[in-house]
A protein has these predicted regions:
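Edge/loop elements at the starts and ends of beta-strands within beta-rich repeat scaffolds
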Residues: 45-48, 63-68, 108-114
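N-terminal export/assembly leaders
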Residues: 145-240
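A cytosolic small-molecule/anion-sensing beta-strand core signal
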Residues: 45-46, 54, 71, 117-118
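Tight coil/turn sites that cap or link beta-strands
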Residues: 37, 53-57, 73, 92, ...
């Protein structure tokens, strides 16, 4: 935890669960969708649990509950393993296959991430075919064939469920995206600092969801936080 961090616990809120298929989604599908700042926990009949972060859209096939498609946002999967029917997640057209596991998948406008807390997954079995064990984090940016694999603390994977956000050399734009997803606040980042790396831990509180985020972010991220009519804007501190 870094000094001046955001302290507290995250409270789950009610989410939107659409049983009626929207335009472009087959009627056999179920859509689970959360607004920014909301969480949702889905229990499947086989005992598998899926926790949804804020601003997330997940599609489940009614005829095959062992298949999910993450269209945007973040979800933590706690899968009851079945070797004869492996659980699969589709993110931006890439399959992630469970091998008895607890894992987190993030889908943003820039790319995808997979982090494993327990067990293992097979990422893109028909392409890159990368096996990820507990404590591994995979990143792949849209439009790139490069798959980056690094270390992650298994204990922090899916920490967003309790408001704990932990980073190691993460760009500020990623931190801002996570905070927006967690709190419901609109947060933009100046291009001059968007790729600045941040290492540390932030714990989001219920108070942050009520609008106190700006007062704390400046010291935590070493930026100037400007209030705008539609949210917050992070930029470099003025030189002294």
């Amino acid at each position: 935890m870094i000094g001046g961090g955001l302290v507290g616990t995250a409270a789950a809120a009610a989410a939107i669960f659409a049983l009626v298929a929207p335009l472009g989604v087959q009627s056999a599908d179920m859509v689970a969708e959360t607004a920014p700042g909301q969480h949702r926990l889905i229990h499947l009949q086989d005992g598998t649990e899926i926790a949804l972060n804020g601003d997330t859209r997940l599609v489940l096939d009614r005829s095959n509950r062992r298949t999910a498609r993450l269209e945007r946002g973040q979800a933590m999967f706690s899968v009851v393993h079945d070797e004869t029917r492996p659980f699969t997640v589709d993110a931006a057209g890439t399959r992630i296959v469970d091998i008895g596991t607890r894992f987190d998948v993030l889908r943003t406008a820039r790319g995808s991430e997979v982090a494993v807390a327990e067990g293992a997954v097979l990422y893109d079995p028909n392409g890159a075919a990368v096996r990820l064990g507990a404590g591994k984090l995979l990143r792949r940016m849209d439009g790139s064939q490069i798959v980056e694999v690094s270390q992650a603390d298994p204990a922090t994977v899916g920490g967003w469920r309790s408001g704990h956000l932990v980073y190691r050399d993460a760009p500020l734009w990623r931190v801002a995206d996570d905070l927006a997803r967690a709190t419901g606040a609109r947060i933009a980042v100046d291009p001059g600092v968007a790729n600045r790396p941040f290492t540390g831990a932030i714990v989001v509180t219920g108070a942050d969801r009520r609008g106190t985020l700006a007062a704390r972010l400046g010291a935590v991220l070493d930026v100037t936080v400007a209030r705008q009519h539609d949210g917050l804007y992070l930029k470099a501190r003025a030189a002294h």
